[in-house]
Amino acid sequence: MALVPYDENVLPALSKLHQSSAEFTLANHRIRLSQDWKRLGVAAVVWDAAVVLCMFLEMGKVDLKGKRVIELGAGTGLVGIVAALLGANVTITDREPALEFLTANVHENIPQGRQKAVQVSELTWGENLDLYPQGGYDLILGADIVYLEETFPALLQTLEHLSSGDTVVLLSCRIRYERDERFLTELRQRFSVQEVHYDSQRDIHVYRAVKNKSNTEL
């Protein structure tokens, strides 16, 4: 996973990434997440895209009660945690190095009565997808997972595998570079995509995608 070096004195707003924890009030709960930039880098801090996606879920425009939800590239687990607090049955995934850290955040923030509704699992995009049910989810969530162009083919393959014709994909991201636009172009070749929310303060877009009928496995 790539790290982008920066001078903390030049970009003081990014100093929050080096804090050992981050706190939020979402889904009527106080959520406290551990962060560990030095050990795990970008996977272990809360990015604006995750916060915006959580706020979008709070709006109630997506029915989460009892739904089968999977989060990709979960990092700190914020989005999956909020989805679970809003009533979903959630599989929260990331690569193996982040799992211990991710699991601790989940256990810390999910009430005992909801623990069985949440599963933390290893998922490297494009690998061992047969471990996950093909088209087996109502909702796929991803926050700030569109940034490394070399991962785009595997991410698209994973989205296709996990999606049925009824699955909704919600991706929250900042469009930084031409490569981000290229990903959206490739996504639109396989999914029907529309922007459903934009946070102008944070410059974060939320996209809704549903697999094109011609690409739905029979």
UniProtKB/Swiss-Prot annotation:
Enzyme class: transferase
EC number(s) per entry: 2.1.1.-
Entry's localization field: Cytoplasm
Family: Belongs to the methyltransferase superfamily. METTL21 family.
Designated gene of the protein: mettl21a
The keyword Methyltransferase is annotated on this UniProt entry: yes
CDD domains: AdoMet_MTases (cd02440)
Known function: Protein-lysine methyltransferase that selectively trimethylates residues in heat shock protein 70 (HSP70) family members.
Any one GO biological process: protein methylation
Reaction equation(s) it catalyzes: L-lysyl-[protein] + 3 S-adenosyl-L-methionine = N(6),N(6),N(6)-trimethyl-L-lysyl-[protein] + 3 S-adenosyl-L-homocysteine + 3 H(+)
Official protein name in the record: Protein N-lysine methyltransferase METTL21A
InterPro entries: Methyltransf_16 (IPR019410), SAM-dependent_MTases_sf (IPR029063)
